[in-house]
């Protein structure tokens, strides 16, 4: 599952740029501190309902902003750990730091 972490990614795709400008995306990306997190940990970090965080995580994975760092089985349930694909995402008009 290991993916290469990049220092910086420049986003030129309009759709990805729009996603990066959303407040929830900024909060999700800012909650990482050098360690991958589960969906529950992300939700707790940003005080967001766990049931709703999955939609946003799925969207960020589909747009190569987050990736699944690892998977493990905990009490019979597959638990995934997520991590940003870069430390800094740059759009033509702003930078978003993780």
Regions found by a protein language model. Give the residues of each.
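Short, cationic-aromatic polyanion-contact patches
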Residues: 11-24, 38, 70-93
């Amino acid at each position: 599952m290991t993916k290469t972490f990049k220092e910086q990614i420049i986003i030129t795709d309009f759709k990805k740029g729009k996603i990066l400008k959303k407040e929830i995306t900024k909060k999700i990306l800012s909650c990482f501190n050098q360690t991958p997190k589960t969906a529950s940990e992300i939700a707790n970090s940003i005080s967001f309902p766990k049931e709703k965080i999955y939609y946003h995580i799925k969207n960020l994975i589909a747009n190569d902003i987050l990736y699944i760092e690892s998977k493990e089985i905990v009490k019979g349930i597959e638990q995934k750990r997520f991590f940003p694909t870069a430390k800094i995402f740059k759009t033509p008009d702003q930078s978003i730091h993780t």
